[in-house]
A protein has these predicted regions:
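Beta/alpha (TIM)-barrel catalytic core signal, keyed to glycine-rich beta->alpha loops juxtaposed to Asp/Glu
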Residues: 1-137, 142
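Short coil/turn segments at secondary-structure boundaries
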Residues: 147-151
Length: 151
């Protein structure tokens, strides 16, 4: 099942991931780097875009998908954990996915062979339980119609 799933968007954990696990369907998450946020492309907020892509029209798309006070603090934690393991933030974001049950092959977008090689190497990264908790604890579910009083 190709689902939207990463450290700053984990809504699939509510229903879809458990359903897929119970029926034997593997997960192939798209946007594992949250359009560059988890790779460190927007340090300090959306105005801090560091690449041509994150400064251009992609910024508006990214802001539309990822909003909330938790987004950039989570990204900062990814950067911290990356430094601890001597890895890139992108590797840590993908390694986190490989620690989640059912995830077999995140769908990544790269522009250079070296980026792909780094992300493939993330398969080998073993994150400590306390680091997984540290990465996950700031997440806040996205408001949806049910959570704001519509039914």
């Amino acid at each position: 099942m190709q689902n939207h799933y990463n450290l700053v968007y984990r809504e699939e954990e509510r229903e879809m991931n458990p359903y897929c696990l119970s029926t034997g369907v593997d997960l192939t998450p798209w946007s594992p780097l949250a359009r560059g946020i988890l790779a460190g492309s927007y340090q300090g907020g959306f105005s801090g875009g560091s690449t041509d892509r994150s400064k251009g029209q992609d910024r508006q798309r990214t802001e539309g998908l990822y909003h909330g006070d938790h987004v950039f603090p989570i990204a900062e934690r990814v950067i911290e954990i990356a430094a601890k393991y001597d890895k890139t933030p992108a590797q840590i974001a993908v390694a986190w996915l490989f620690h989640k049950p059912g995830v077999t092959s995140p769908v990544v977008g790269v522009s250079k062979v070296a980026q792909l090689e780094q992300l493939v190497a993330a398969v080998e990264i073993q994150l400590a339980e306390e680091d997984l908790y540290y990465l996950e604890e700031l997440y806040r579910p996205v408001d949806n119609l049910l959570s704001i009083g519509f039914s």
